[in-house]
Swiss-Prot record:
Substrate binds at residues 293, 611, 673. This is Anhydrosialidase. Its main location: secreted. Keywords: Glycosidase, Hydrolase, Lyase, Repeat, Secreted, Signal. It comes from Macrobdella decora (North American leech). BNR repeats lie at residues 328-339, 511-522, 571-582, 620-631.
């Protein structure tokens, strides 16, 4: 079975068990208040409608009469609704605020009386309104503004439905943020969406662009026939008290309304006629994870393209959680990808597909006891063809926020060893160390014990491997239950039930592969250099860098950040990764997340671009191979939030406009992780010396999507054919409203002509 076939099957399997109630109590107005949008027109329409609620007695009497008549008409029609397609319409252009009536279409009376069914439509929006109704059915008379059904989109990529018969009767909502696209390759594009209202299963499901997005289960199932006084079917808006609310502008390519509930497989196929980007890692793949974050993408000197990402099992939460590192590769320039593997993983908690709740309480729940890996970095030594995979290693129940101060190592006779605590020892004494050949020593006696660890830090007593019970995790309401199973797994020093326990701080983990990821070395903990005053020292996710020219040619570098005597730092190796040296790049102690990426200038000097807590990206320069760094210089023309976002920057191998070039990817907004841009910077030799020898002219910028669309962590790579590969999070990963979204890690390709063709100078 091909990769696409396996993905479709995986989606179908995950769909079969997906039960995710979302925002059941929230009206569209509530959702609008949660968004930062440009929808002032929408709000004005809603306010006008609410003011009209205070209608006089005559208007109320008239509305009541129409309501009774509408109910009788609906009851008569519902008894005779035919099977199959009730309505079909194609190529409808809609001016914003005008709407388009379908009341005269054949089948409209049946649509008004639907007790269940399926609605499939394609659209292209040219509007920036915050909320835009694509299709609606409702009661448009005075005093009945809360009696309607509609399918809507938001200008931040969300899709949803609202089914209301005034809040006192019923109000059902279902939505999924970051689900649809507005702009692709510089053009406004069509999306295909679908709603299935399934009375037999008491369930509504939303689909878009080949993916099942969200499910709402309601024992008291309702649909259009349950709305009192339905009098209109409308495209491009919702008629509320005689006015068009939630106006859409653009084109409805086609709409089909069915009286029956089509299958999930049919709707995945029907909506899959429009897709943008590819999921290298996706819910239901062999990793058994539903959620992926933190992209890494690298083209090797052989032309193979490799990728890595966090496979997050406990929703999209950071550590502490259960997180493994997924890896995949492409041997045809990113056209197809291998099945993922998990070169960095722990087994203390089961790996399984579980839908994490997104309600206001459940979305905050985290797995408490698992060990985890987080934030991959890929790097190739082009001289040896060896690839390295780095990540932060977090022992059981540890994340950056609760990591203990210290390195986790102890110096014995001038050498540093990983220190351990015997689980029965009183207090917090770490009186044991892992010495040569993995043997555990009692430091008080300086004698070996009968215990040792293997290359994965699994424990042995004499020659018998020790085991512990694996944990499972399941929800009971909004409570997460973590419980032991009957499954035995190898006992590991990073697990909570180990007899020897590692110090509860973060570590830097490394593996290498000499066969492009087919097999991997033993696990190496390389962070013995972590300062003892440091709470955490972690990688800047993305890729590392090898210097290609100058006196430091061949040196390997990986960006790091910390919260002790420096925010930004680096580790480097001059012996092909056998040994690593840590250097601090500043003396800042504010604790800003200084995630950084490195590029090389023509003479072998380095520039690093980093996330800051100052609404900007900063640049620092090194002329000694990364051992010392200049002060930070804010990058002009790119704005970020106060908390910042990881960025990606790479060298491009060919001149652009006759000059060396670098390419950078980042959000460009101060009010959220959104408005993703790709910039091309031309490198100029200033004629100066030292750190001022080169300047970068950010000549071109390219919009990945429209300004309100989410865009978070990203990684760029120059592909073998010269195109630029982009692996990125197509959502706002900081927003609490966008937690725990599936299949938001997208891979796309862009040519240099595309990136320069529409761009404007900064």
């Amino acid at each position: 079975m091909g990769r696409i076939g396996k993905k479709a099957m995986a989606i179908a399997l995950v769909s079969a068990v997906m039960v995710t109630p979302l925002n059941v109590c929230a009206t569209v107005e509530n959702q609008e208040q949660q968004q930062v949008t440009q929808g002032a027109e929408d709000i004005a329409v809603i306010d006008d409608a609410q003011e009209t609620v205070a209608a006089d007695e005559a208007q109320a009497d008239e509305a009541a009469a129409i309501t009774v008549e509408g109910r009788e008409t609906a009851e008569e029609s519902s008894a005779s609704i035919p099977e199959g397609i009730l309505m079909e319409k194609n190529n409808v252009d809609i001016a914003e605020g005008q709407g388009y009536s379908l009341d005269q279409e054949a089948g409209a009376k049946y649509v008004k009386a639907m007790t269940q069914g399926t609605i499939i439509l394609s659209y292209k929006s040219t509007s920036e309104n915050g909320i835009q109704s694509l299709f609606s059915v409702g009661n448009s008379t005075a005093g009945n503004q809360d009696r309607h059904f509609h399918i809507y989109i938001t200008n931040s990529g969300g899709i949803g439905i609202e089914l209301r018969n005034t809040d006192g009767v019923f109000n059902y909502t279902l939505d999924r943020p970051a689900s649809v696209r507005a702009l692709y390759k510089g053009e406004r594009v069509f999306n295909t969406v679908a709603l299935k209202a399934d009375a037999a299963n008491k369930q509504c499901r939303l689909f878009a662009n080949g993916e099942l997005l969200a499910t709402l289960d309601k024992d008291a199932f309702k649909f259009i026939s349950d709305i009192t006084g339905v009098d209109n079917v409308t495209l491009g808006g919702t008629k509320r008290q005689g006015k068009i609310a939630y106006p859409f502008g653009g084109t409805i390519g086609d709409i089909k309304v069915y009286s029956n509930a089509l299958s999930d497989e049919e709707l995945i196929q029907a909506t899959g006629v429009t897709t943008y980007g590819e999921n290298i890692f996706y819910a239901g793949d062999v990793t058994e994870s539903n959620y992926f974050r933190i992209p890494s993408l690298l083209t090797l000197s052989t032309g193979t393209v490799i990728s890595a990402a966090d496979a997050r099992y406990g929703g999209t939460h950071d550590s502490k959680s259960k997180i493994n590192i997924a890896f995949a590769k492409s041997t045809d320039g990113g056209n197809t990808w291998s099945e993922p593997t998990l070169p960095l993983k722990f087994d203390d908690y089961i790996a399984k597909n579980i839908d994490w709740p997104r309600d206001s309480v459940g979305k905050n729940v985290q797995i408490q006891g698992s060990a985890s890996y987080i934030d991959p970095v890929l790097l190739e030594d082009k001289l040896t063809k060896r690839i390295f995979l780095f990540a932060d290693l977090m022992p059981a129940g540890i994340g950056s926020s609760n990591a203990s101060v210290g390195s986790g190592f102890k110096e014995v006779n001038g050498k540093k060893y990983l220190k351990l605590r015997w689980h029965k020892d009183a207090g917090r004494a770490y009186d044991y160390t892992i010495r040569e050949k993995g043997v555990i020593y009692n430091d008080a006696t300086n004698q070996p014990t009968e215990f040792r660890v293997d290359g994965e830090y699994n424990l042995y007593q004499h020659d018998t491997n020790l085991t512990c019970k694996q944990y499972d995790y399941n929800f009971s309401g909004n409570n997460l239950i973590e419980s032991k199973t009957d499954v035995d797994v190898n006992m590991n020093i990073f697990y909570k039930n180990s007899v020897f326990k590692a110090f509860p701080t973060n570590y830097l983990a490394m593996r290498y592969s000499d066969d492009e990821g087919a097999s991997w070395s033993d696990l190496d903990i390389v962070s013995s250099f972590k300062p003892e005053v440091s709470k955490f020292l972690v990688v800047g996710p993305g890729i590392g860098k090898q210097i290609s020219t100058g006196e430091n040619a061949g040196r390997l570098l990986v960006p790091l950040y910390s919260k002790s005597s420096a925010e930004l730092g680096f580790m480097y190796s001059d012996d092909h990764g056998d040994n690593w040296t840590y250097v601090e790049a500043d003396n800042l102690t504010g604790g800003a997340t200084a995630e950084a990426q490195i590029v090389e200038m023509p003479d072998g000097s380095l520039k690093t671009y980093l996330r800051t807590g100052s609404n900007c990206i900063a640049e620092v320069t090194s002329i000694d191979g990364g051992e010392t760094w200049s002060d930070r210089v804010p990058l002009q023309g790119i704005s970020t939030t106060s908390y910042g976002t990881q960025l990606s920057v790479i060298n491009y191998s060919q001149p652009i406009d006759g000059k060396p070039a670098i390419i950078l990817s980042s959000p460009n907004a101060t009010n959220g992780r959104k408005n993703g841009k790709i910039w091309i910077g031309l490198v100029n030799d200033t004629g100066n010396t030292g750190i001022d020898k080169y300047s970068v002219e950010w000549k071109y910028s390219y919009a990945v999507d429209t300004p309100q669309m989410g865009y978070s962590y990203s990684c760029l790579a120059e592909l073998p054919d010269g195109q630029v590969g982009l692996l990125y999070e197509k959502y706002d990963s900081w927003s609490r409203n966008e937690l725990h979204l599936k299949d938001i890690l997208k891979f796309e390709k862009y040519s240099i002509s595309e990136l320069t063709g529409q761009a404007s100078g900064n």
